[in-house]
Amino acid sequence: MNAVRRKKLMWVMFTLAGAAIAVVLVIYAIGQQTDYYFDATAIAQGEAPQDKRIRAGGMVVAGSVQRAPNDPLSVEFAITDFQSTVPVTYQGILPDLFAENSGVVATGKMQGDTFVAGEVLAKHDENYMPPEVAKSMKENNRIGAVPSSEQYNPAEKVHETKTLQQ
């Protein structure tokens, strides 16, 4: 092999190696930004990883929204998929369309049995339900009337008190 061919071969090899490294880095970066969706039943069964960012979706349980008396930005509520209920804590301003008996998708991490949300997204009109929530409820044949706070599983303790304790 002469020097010119060797030089071209080396150039091609370095180019391919660089492209392969770039592809691996892009795939890794995309994987790090992926938030997996879990419904309330999957979270209650322990399928959601602890201390890893995930998305949790469901309907806000009526009567579960509680604000701390001395911290108006601290909110606790529960989400349900009509089979299980998961307590959620959130520190921040809730969207204007956030309401009980409406669909939400929250991004955050599991800490024990509580979902600590860093972001809460609410539905944008009365007929909208987040696609992940609608699919989950359809799979469980649970689309229908939204349960009140008395109808969701009372065996699952959501809150110890009606107000947050400091």
From Swiss-Prot:
Family recorded in the similarity comment: Belongs to the CcmE/CycJ family.
Keyword Transmembrane helix: yes
Organism: Psychrobacter cryohalolentis (strain ATCC BAA-1226 / DSM 17306 / VKM B-2378 / K5)
Domain of life: Bacteria
This protein's GO CC annotations: plasma membrane
UniProt subcellular location: Cell inner membrane
Binding annotation for heme: 124, 128
Periplasmic topological intervals: 30-166
Protein name: Cytochrome c-type biogenesis protein CcmE
